[in-house]
Amino acid sequence: MIPRIVVVLLSVLAVVTARRSYEGYKVYGIVPESPDEAEILYQIRQSNPDLDFWHLTKQPGDEARVLVAPKDQRSFLIKLIRHGLHYQEVISDVEGTLAPYNEPRTRGMSLDRDVSTSYLRHNEINEYLQTLSQKYPSLVSVEEAGTSYEGRSIKTITINKKPGNAVVFLDAGIHAREWIAPATALYAIEQLVEHSSENQEVLSNLTWVIMPVVNPDGYEFSHETDRFWRKTRKPTGKTCKGTDGNRNFDYHWGEVGASTQACADTFRGETAFSEPETRAVRDAVMKLKGSCKFYLSLHSYGNYILYPWGWTSKLPETWEAIDEVAQAGAEAIKQSTGSRYTVGSSTNVLYAAAGGSDDWAFAVAEVPISITMELPGGGNGGFNPPPSSIEKIVNESWVGIKAMALKVAQMF
């Protein structure tokens, strides 16, 4: 008989060895000095799906960051040099930066404390929601909005459900590796539920429906196996897995900025709403059609508050109302912490990316204020703020979320 301790050690070893290694990977920073150079970078991204662009905008002077595998580094640098693009090596040892995140999280703390000090796993998040529904039954209810491809429960929490209230729908975690987004959603839940008396101005006339993890399969995979996994986990071919959930919504689906290559990080999916995860968002929002006045999707990273359209540089007819809400969030954060957020339409600030959730919510679900908030980055690369940074980021983000919700409450 194999001693139990040996079995445990072998199990731990199996988990450790299953992790994807980023040994030899580097992250490069490139600052385009003109719109033409920014366009060159965009074209490099479009024609090289193996390059993982962590950050890329149209704005000259805004540093792009690219994760590059050892096999691609020489050819990538040749491209940059050929086009006269200046670069620097931002992270020379990507694997080395991941060690703190591969260590087991210390248990024994209460979940409410964990919300702003560590990244909860999906089962812990659902446990937290359930605990709140039991502790505050008159304020909170929890429902299953859907089931992921691998069978995980996708839950929503409804806070302060009252007839006639305008509804705020907030989601996070469409992209697996953006851990700070679910952490921020959880902090918003904590503030609205456990500190409700301090947040009555955004509770008295508003009902909140929050889906803290849209893509639980990818989220768990990014914790257990591949820290920088972005997509869902449903197979999309013989060798590839996953779809970019934020290219999978059925509004101008499959158009500009959405890849047809199944292995690409921006793969649009085999059809619109091919993923059970995006269907869960669709169904939850459509149930609220008419009463939902504010759709907010949390992403990272990059200090942006963005709104439609993502498929064209044209603006919606009612863009000024959306911009007013977005500007309220940006100004509140600036006044509170000094951090500056860029506000504008997705295509004009970043790049065109059709099939996004905010475009769909605005055009199809008819939510009048539809916004994507790109949260601050952290750590060496951007996607990996250390646990010590969570509290600062979620506090700052809540200031902006609360200000936007207050503006919506005043409008509707």
UniProtKB/Swiss-Prot annotation:
Top-level taxonomic group: Eukaryota
InterPro entries noted in UniProt: M14A-like_propep, M14A_act_pep, Peptidase_M14
UniProt KW keywords: Carboxypeptidase, Disulfide bond, Endoplasmic reticulum, Glycoprotein, Hydrolase, Metal-binding, Metalloprotease, Protease, Signal, Zinc, Zymogen
Record: residues binding a peptide: 175-178, 230, 246-247, 300-301, 351
Domain (Peptidase M14) ranges: 118-408
Record Gene3D superfamilies: Metallocarboxypeptidase-like, Zn peptidases
GO biological process: proteolysis
Propeptide stretches in the record: 19-75
Impact reported for residue 358 to E: Abolishes cleavage of C-terminal arginine residue, whereas cleavage of C-terminal lysine residue is not affected. Cleavage of C-terminal arginine residue is restored
GO-annotated cellular components: endoplasmic reticulum; extracellular space
Cofactor: record remark: Binds 1 zinc ion per subunit.
UniProt cross-references to CDD domains, sorted A to Z: M14_CP_A-B_like
Alphabetized SUPFAM superfamilies for the sequence: Protease propeptides/inhibitors, Zn-dependent exopeptidases
EC number in record: 3.4.17.2
Tissue and organ expression note: Expressed in midgut (at protein level).
Family to which the UniProt record says this protein belongs: Belongs to the peptidase M14 family.
Name of the protein in its database record: Carboxypeptidase B1
